[in-house]
């Protein structure tokens, strides 16, 4: 029996680097011989920018142009080929201040299923808006096998990660969703990450170093893999993403997280910075 596609949902604090991370993971998965579809779930519709080099038309744009007649839409109307053979879709969103972005995600999945698009891929990756875990933007968790949380070594990102973990736990009550783990992005240290996972056990899949090229790649509209074609010094950075891909393709067991209460977590992370030993280390 053919193994079905693995579905991933990538979350994290706004501005933490989810889309950059997602695009590089998608290319890494493609480098491992997998057919990959990345679905951007953000009204900014810029998730796939580093794969395609431009802002592709969204599902909502296409539906509006076709008068919301699903039968008039074909896969080539909404799926764009990006770098490394990764296929790209942008859900888009309602006008600012109106409608529900989560509804748009649901309509996107519905349309892609009608087009039998999901049947064509080995991996489907949802790159989701910020750290919003309302019912709407938690919608990709309804379709995912694994959630990945992108963080750094800072208080705010880990606080957001804990809230996302709570959302995963809630969704896991009714479906086989698991947290694959944390991905540390652009951080020179991981001591606060380690402090958090000692209190809230969960895997740390990989921690990417504080390298400016990771941030710059977003502005250039290129993945690290594409940049490495002309700058071989970036190949070791690409290896981090290949490590993540290998971990995910092994289909890890994952966990149902047990997040900390907000006040408990606030005290834990605040205490980390307030301890005398920590203060001496910072002098």
From Swiss-Prot:
Q: Which PROSITE patterns match?
A: NIFH_FRXC_1, NIFH_FRXC_2, NIFH_FRXC_3
Q: What is its EC number?
A: 1.3.7.7
Which catalytic reaction applies to this protein?
A: chlorophyllide a + oxidized 2[4Fe-4S]-[ferredoxin] + 2 ADP + 2 phosphate = protochlorophyllide a + reduced 2[4Fe-4S]-[ferredoxin] + 2 ATP + 2 H2O
- Entry cofactor note text? Binds 1 [4Fe-4S] cluster per dimer.
Q: Does the keyword 4Fe-4S feature in the UniProt annotation? A: yes
Name any cofactors this protein relies on: [4Fe-4S] cluster
What domain of life does the native source organism fall in?
Answer: Bacteria
Q: Which residues cross the membrane?
A: none
Pathway the protein takes part in:
Porphyrin-containing compound metabolism; chlorophyll biosynthesis (light-independent)
User: Coiled-coil ranges per the record?
Assistant: none
Alphabetical GO biological process terms = light-independent chlorophyll biosynthetic process; photosynthesis, dark reaction
Q: Which CDD domains match?
A: Bchl-like (cd02032)
Complexes and interactors: Homodimer. Protochlorophyllide reductase is composed of three subunits; ChlL, ChlN and ChlB.
The family note in this entry says: Belongs to the NifH/BchL/ChlL family.
NCBIfam families in the record? DPOR_bchL
Its name, as the record gives it, is Light-independent protochlorophyllide reductase iron-sulfur ATP-binding protein
Question: Which species is listed as the source?
Answer: Synechococcus sp. (strain JA-2-3B'a(2-13)) (Cyanobacteria bacterium Yellowstone B-Prime)
| UniProt lineage | Bacteria, Bacillati, Cyanobacteriota, Cyanophyceae, Synechococcales
Encoding gene, per UniProt annotation: chlL
């Amino acid at each position: 029996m053919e193994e079905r596609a693995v579905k991933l949902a990538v979350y994290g604090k706004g501005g933490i680097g989810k889309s950059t991370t997602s695009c590089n993971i998608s290319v890494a998965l493609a480098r491992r011989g997998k057919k990959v579809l990345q679905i951007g779930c953000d009204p900014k519709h810029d998730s796939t920018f580093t794969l395609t080099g431009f802002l592709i038309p969204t599902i909502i744009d296409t539906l509006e142009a076709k008068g919301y007649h699903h039968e008039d839409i074909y896969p080539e109307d909404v799926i764009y080929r990006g770098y490394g053979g990764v296929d790209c879709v942008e859900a888009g969103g309602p006008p600012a201040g109106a409608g529900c972005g989560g509804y748009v995600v649901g309509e996107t999945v519905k349309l892609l299923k009608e087009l039998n698009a999901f049947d064509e891929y080995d991996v489907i990756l949802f790159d989701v808006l910020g750290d919003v875990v309302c019912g709407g933007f938690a919608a990709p968790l309804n379709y995912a096998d694994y959630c990945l949380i992108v963080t750094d070594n800072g208080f705010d990102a880990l606080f957001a990660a804990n809230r996302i973990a709570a959302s995963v736990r809630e969704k896991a009550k009714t479906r086989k969703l698991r947290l694959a783990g944390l991905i540390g992005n652009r951080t020179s240290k991981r001591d606060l990450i380690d402090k958090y996972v000692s209190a809230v056990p969960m895997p740390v899949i990989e921690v990417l170093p504080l390298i400016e090229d990771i941030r710059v790649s977003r502005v250039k509209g290129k993945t690290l893999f594409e940049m490495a074609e002309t700058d071989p010094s970036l190949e070791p950075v690409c290896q981090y993403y290949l490590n993540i891909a290998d971990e995910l393709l092994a289909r890890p067991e994952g966990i149902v997280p047990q997040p900390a209460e907000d006040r408990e977590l606030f005290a834990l992370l605040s205490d980390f910075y307030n301890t005398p030993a920590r203060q001496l280390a910072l002098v």
